[in-house]
Amino acid sequence: MSTFTHINCQGEANMVDVSGKQESVREARAEALVTMSPETLNMIISGQHHKGDVFATARIAGIQAAKRTWDLIPLCHPLLLSKVEVSLTPVVERNQVRIESLCRLTGKTGVEMEALTAASVAALTIYDMCKAVQKDIVIEQVRLLEKCGGKSGHFIAK
């Protein structure tokens, strides 16, 4: 069984020391789903939302969030991300927007939290921009899809 890397031998929260690790290319992909009414989704897709381009705003918010993950999650390292991508795809038959984020760097620690934060904040931005027209929007299935690089190896969600 694995141990918690962020807890020291006294049981206290602790930032992991990565100074002895080798640099490698690390990449992570995450997703979030945002479910809403057909009318709200159509308003977003057609560009008729009174607040502007929901997808563009959510994309930028996700990218900004990935870059600030270390500032939001206390034990995350500040990272020099070399790539952040956020894509938003309407899934009309399910009244959803599927958000997928990708983060990449060459470094000593992984980028899973950055990818998860990007997808989460993009989803929250959609909610924020659309809450005036629909309050019961659901954000769900925020999850890591894939990670590679580093000593823990390659992970792909089932």
From Swiss-Prot:
Pathway: Cofactor biosynthesis; molybdopterin biosynthesis. InterPro entries: MoaC, MoaC_bact/euk, MoaC_sf, MoCo_biosynth_MoaA/MoaC, Mopterin_CF_biosynth-C_dom. Keywords: Lyase, Molybdenum cofactor biosynthesis. It is an enzyme of class 4 (lyase). Substrate binds at residues 75-77, 113-114. The active site is at residue 128. GO terms for biological process: Mo-molybdopterin cofactor biosynthetic process. Its EC number is 4.6.1.17. GO terms for molecular function: cyclic pyranopterin monophosphate synthase activity. It catalyses: (8S)-3',8-cyclo-7,8-dihydroguanosine 5'-triphosphate = cyclic pyranopterin phosphate + diphosphate. Belongs to the MoaC family. Catalyzes the conversion of (8S)-3',8-cyclo-7,8-dihydroguanosine 5'-triphosphate to cyclic pyranopterin monophosphate (cPMP). This is Cyclic pyranopterin monophosphate synthase.
